[in-house]
Amino acid sequence: MNIAWLLAENTLLPPGQDTQPMRDIAPIWGSWRTQRAYQTDNVVCWDADQAAILIEQGYAEICNLYIPKMVYDTLNQPPRVNVFGGAFDFVVDSVDDIVAAHLSASVADVIIMVGFDLESRPNAKISRTNYIGLLAQSIRDSGKQWVIVDHPKNLDEPIQKLSNITRDLLPNVLQLLNNNSD
């Protein structure tokens, strides 16, 4: 069984929480914003200007960097950089999270989501509504099992209705996965 950790771009792990136990279990996917704090193994960057900066800083040497194919071509196809296709025809919060969800689900059977704010919000901005909807669609269509970690509040309805998603606490998930790897 292949497992992947998926960190939301605004993830804040509890103080003192080392990511090494997570990394010992499975690779970590997330936005470029998570790489420095959490040493994300697989880094997604949708933004063309930021992708150019990351390439210049050598991110492709320290992680698996994923950028849009169109950006890759405009940057003269830099070595060691991975590409993905697709586009967004409407405004979406945290595009990197959506792309990372799709990519991680393409290689893992179980995706463990950390740091995601999936709380129901009345009168949410359309960009947030689109984010929740696209994330729910990615989870539903993947056919994989998803685990939301440390999310104490009620989930937004499109996420709550999914049959392939569960919730748990990070210490429980780490203990369960460590026990299964022995």
Positions of predicted regions on the chain:
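Metal-ion/cofactor- or nucleotide/acyl-coenzyme-handling active-site neighborhoods
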Residues: M1-D182
